[in-house]
Amino acid sequence: MEEARRQSLEEDFEGQATHTGPKGVINDWRKFKLESEDSDSIPPCKKEILKQMSSPQSRDDKDSKERFSRKMSIQEYELIHQDKEDENCLRKYRRQCMQDMHQKLSFGPRYGFVYELETGEQFLETIEKEQKITTIVVHIYEDGIKGCDALNSSLACLAAEYPMVKFCKIKASNTGAGDRFSSDVLPTLLVYKGGELISNFLSVAEQFAEEFFAGDVESFLNEYGLLPEREIHALEQTSMEEDVE
């Protein structure tokens, strides 16, 4: 029904078109639009503007043309201003949708700091009882071993940026398997998921420069696909894409 009415209006418009060229077609359409609208539903001020837009003044009527130009300028400003408001609303809506999406995807537990494991039993319990979707990064260290302090500091920063990843640390002497983690293989990183060891890095400090920081450790773990996408980074990227648009 609606499609038939729209087609009929288009045919009527084609029959009433009297101008040629882009400006003539636009003026014909404005005039037809005004006539086809319910007169009671159009505010008087809008109706007057539509009339003026559909019936440009003659070049000899200087005063009328100036008045028309002023009204057109105001109308154009309002339209542009409204378009900008619409764009801002759309950006806010898309940003909110992205935030909602990340919240829905981030339905697992959140941590945000490095857990100190005191015993081997606590170590095993953490691996076995944590949710299967959670990635667990365990740093096995000892005081005084080169690279251990820097790695602990780096993991503390990463824990804040990746709250869905559980970062832990435990002294080799507290694991109950100190003979397996001698000083020459420290610091060691073990990565678990779903109760299974998925990556292990012995003497991991050798992968970095003499001085290394959180960004270096982050890049290293990302090379092996062990970290999820940072939530803050994803939202910033979305905001940048919206600004480009």
Curated annotation (Swiss-Prot):
<comment type="function">
    <text>May participate in the regulation of visual phototransduction or in the integration of photoreceptor metabolism. Inhibits the transcriptional activation activity of the cone-rod homeobox CRX.</text>
</comment>
<dbReference type="InterPro" id="IPR023196">
    <property type="entry name" value="Phosducin_N_dom_sf"/>
</dbReference>
<dbReference type="GO" id="GO:0005829">
    <property type="term" value="C:cytosol"/>
</dbReference>
<dbReference type="GO" id="GO:0001750">
    <property type="term" value="C:photoreceptor outer segment"/>
</dbReference>
<dbReference type="GO" id="GO:0001917">
    <property type="term" value="C:photoreceptor inner segment"/>
</dbReference>
<keyword id="KW-0597">Phosphoprotein</keyword>
<feature type="modified residue" description="Phosphoserine; by PKA">
    <location>
        <position position="73"/>
    </location>
</feature>
<dbReference type="GO" id="GO:0008277">
    <property type="term" value="P:regulation of G protein-coupled receptor signaling pathway"/>
</dbReference>
<dbReference type="GO" id="GO:0007601">
    <property type="term" value="P:visual perception"/>
</dbReference>
<dbReference type="InterPro" id="IPR024253">
    <property type="entry name" value="Phosducin_thioredoxin-like_dom"/>
</dbReference>
<keyword id="KW-0716">Sensory transduction</keyword>
<keyword id="KW-0963">Cytoplasm</keyword>
<feature type="domain" description="Phosducin">
    <location>
        <begin position="1"/>
        <end position="241"/>
    </location>
</feature>
<feature type="region of interest" description="Disordered">
    <location>
        <begin position="1"/>
        <end position="67"/>
    </location>
</feature>
<dbReference type="GO" id="GO:0005634">
    <property type="term" value="C:nucleus"/>
</dbReference>
<feature type="region of interest" description="Thioredoxin fold">
    <location>
        <begin position="111"/>
        <end position="245"/>
    </location>
</feature>
<dbReference type="Pfam" id="PF02114">
    <property type="entry name" value="Phosducin"/>
</dbReference>
<keyword id="KW-0966">Cell projection</keyword>
<keyword id="KW-0539">Nucleus</keyword>
<dbReference type="InterPro" id="IPR001200">
    <property type="entry name" value="Phosducin"/>
</dbReference>
<keyword id="KW-0844">Vision</keyword>
<comment type="subunit">
    <text>Forms a complex with the beta and gamma subunits of the GTP-binding protein, transducin. Interacts with CRX.</text>
</comment>
<protein>
    <recommendedName>
        <fullName>Phosducin</fullName>
    </recommendedName>
</protein>
<feature type="compositionally biased region" description="Basic and acidic residues">
    <location>
        <begin position="58"/>
        <end position="67"/>
    </location>
</feature>
<dbReference type="InterPro" id="IPR036249">
    <property type="entry name" value="Thioredoxin-like_sf"/>
</dbReference>
<keyword id="KW-0969">Cilium</keyword>
<dbReference type="InterPro" id="IPR051499">
    <property type="entry name" value="Phosducin-like_reg"/>
</dbReference>
<comment type="similarity">
    <text>Belongs to the phosducin family.</text>
</comment>
